[in-house]
């Protein structure tokens, strides 16, 4: 075994040990006591001023923010007047994610318990006309069956109950968490593991948050390389989009900070590797995927693209190596450095961006384009997943970009026998040369794609709720990445000097914690439950008063929590 191979074996062993069962988020022994001690709720004297600086908008505070939602629901549970609305809210959410065979029974239970005046939790705040329409309508497994009721319930809760919440101890507890969330964070909070890959401006490595033990991927953008190659705009756009979009089909940004040499984006770690690696490297004798596996990934990519396009974001770099698998075998799209956000009133953009072989004809011709370019790239990606080669060149064929451009613009695509008629037809609709005729995002949704016969066996509701079992589940003992020596190294960048404007850009970039992923981390790793301790008499907890109590180090399954 040469030194390079030995280095990979050692690095892989350390990485696998750190991530534990797979995500490394529930191993108390992996937590650093020094940083663990810093995760403590502050006294109210330090955080009450946040009341004037945070958004007090109901949806953001009580629905979108995970800790905010939990605390608001805990508050509602303490007042019997609000319990019917709380339980209806929770039961409708449960109905929306339930298996189809369970939904009729759950629907009947909702009708009997909350809409019948004789029900134990009758919701008298609901408009009786709306209730009558729901009762008269079809019951069973219909999507959106109870959405009018849910909207009315949240509207009710956003009035009097919300105002009561803002004056409660539960809201003060929320302010404590927001103070903790806002504390500075930097590279010293993270432990680096092996390099997973390389991008245009730096490496991506596995890392572990020292306080919680949660594993992440850290994308390091070399400052000098960014400046020399004029990469500031792409870096800040990627960071802003990742922080803005929260989707189970797009990698999430948890932290952003700077080091002496790099700008760092700490994101969802995708332990299953990228789709390109699986196409060509997992089974080299039989590259490519069976069609059902390719269809499953395509469906998840469609949902991710829809979430981007609904926020007016053109991705521009969809390809197999930017589609990553998580622990369970579900995918997320990543690397949004080439994405562009359309301004209000702007329907198209212009500019040469993307990867040769994946760029749409209108983009290659220098024309204005819209979201449709991403669906052309989806067609190329689906084709490659099935055929183990691109649609415009043979596997291993070296083609000059000029020739490749000509093929994309004018030549028809040929399909090998591996394609069923349905997958061929779907690909052809995506690889349509005319963007006006191309299948894609229409009227704010991807429903036209979902309706295609290719997805007849996909339950889109369950897919988007994360309830389907993927066709391939990664092995927790395997590192799905190239050997370290095959990743390659960057050459040293010389002759770059930073000025005041550079420093200001770096400081703007290093914004610290991202609210929703940070709160999810606190919940998933058990810290929310461990620190959210209340007195049995309902009086103000000691931590709010600033009274320190000697506590044991929290664990993911601690019994300290009274309400979680």
Swiss-Prot record:
The modification Cysteine methyl ester is found at residue 561. It is an enzyme of class 2 (transferase). Residues 190-455 form the Protein kinase domain. It is found in: Membrane; Cell projection, Cilium, Photoreceptor outer segment. Residues 1-15 are annotated as: Interaction with RCVRN. The active site is at residue 317. One of its GO terms (molecular function) is rhodopsin kinase activity. Keywords: ATP-binding, Cell projection, Kinase, Lipoprotein, Membrane, Methylation, Nucleotide-binding, Phosphoprotein, Prenylation, Sensory transduction, Serine/threonine-protein kinase, Transferase, Vision. Residues 562-564 form a propeptide. Retina-specific kinase involved in the signal turnoff via phosphorylation of rhodopsin (RHO), the G protein- coupled receptor that initiates the phototransduction cascade. This rapid desensitization is essential for scotopic vision and permits rapid adaptation to changes in illumination. May play a role in the maintenance of the outer nuclear layer in the retina. Belongs to the protein kinase superfamily. AGC Ser/Thr protein kinase family. GPRK subfamily. This is Rhodopsin kinase GRK1. It comes from Rattus norvegicus.
